[in-house]
């Protein structure tokens, strides 16, 4: 196999790895979006009822009552907490969801472009493989 052909096979492998990484990134974005939406829903429901589920860990929760549901405490860094108005946090989270949706579109576009390159490269490789096969067939001695 000549060097150019090997390089094309390596490029095909790299493209496939890129698509896998981009799909993984999409999955992470989806999880972040879902977490933000759940948080928004929880904050919205606190406006109706102060009752919340307090996570204890390992999937265990206890029912509790929020003392001040109008204020949300956010972790904004290592050991740094910030208190904000619940409506402000909801708007911030909705903005984050929108930004993540836009990022998701960009990632999907990149996946499509990479897949197009994969299709183009595979087609090229198939043509070259067919040409090599034909050349090899012509070089074989004919037997009667």
UniProtKB/Swiss-Prot annotation:
Listed GO MF terms: unfolded protein binding
InterPro entries attached to this UniProt entry: PFD_alpha_archaea (IPR011599), Prefoldin (IPR009053), Prefoldin_subunit_alpha (IPR004127)
GO biological process: protein folding
GO cellular component: cytoplasm; prefoldin complex
UniProt KW keywords: Chaperone, Cytoplasm
Main location: cytoplasm
Subcellular location field: Cytoplasm
Keyword Chaperone: yes
Disulfide bonds: none
Pfam families: Prefoldin
SUBUNIT field: Heterohexamer of two alpha and four beta subunits.
Protein role: Molecular chaperone capable of stabilizing a range of proteins. Seems to fulfill an ATP-independent, HSP70-like function in archaeal de novo protein folding.
Similarity-based family: Belongs to the prefoldin alpha subunit family.
Entry protein name: Prefoldin subunit alpha
Organism: Methanococcus maripaludis (strain C7 / ATCC BAA-1331)
